């Protein structure tokens, strides 16, 4: 029997959350896949050290708005960003990983 732990968390701003114990929780849970929503950051604003995990981020074009990230222990076969609908894909709301 194969078991996997999958966590999804709407952090409502990862930069503030990172200063309030996010990394401790992340490490303690030891999830196989950890997804976060509402990262509300732009590329380069924060780097999270997650040894043993592959990181995938989708940033919103609008500063301080939406955004998603996935951390996974197993490297996916493929990764895609967005829905293929331009008006929605600017919000960084969707990341699809295929295993």
Q: Where are the model-predicted features located?
A:
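Structured beta-strand-rich core segments of catalytic domains in phosphoester-bond hydrolases
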Residues: 40, 46-99
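N-terminal, active-site-proximal structural segment of metallo-dependent hydrolase catalytic domains
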Residues: 2-49, 60, 65
């Amino acid at each position: 029997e194969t078991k996997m732990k999958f966590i999804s968390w709407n952090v409502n701003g990862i930069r503030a959350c990172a200063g309030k114990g996010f990394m401790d929780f992340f490490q303690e849970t030891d999830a196989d896949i950890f997804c976060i929503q509402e990262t509300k950051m732009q590329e380069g604003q924060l780097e999270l050290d997650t040894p043993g995990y592959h990181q995938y981020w989708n940033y919103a074009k609008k500063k301080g708005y939406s955004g998603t990230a996935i951390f996974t222990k197993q490297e996916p076969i493929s990764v895609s960003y967005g829905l293929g609908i331009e008006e929605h894909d600017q919000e960084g709301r969707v990341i699809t990983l295929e295993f």
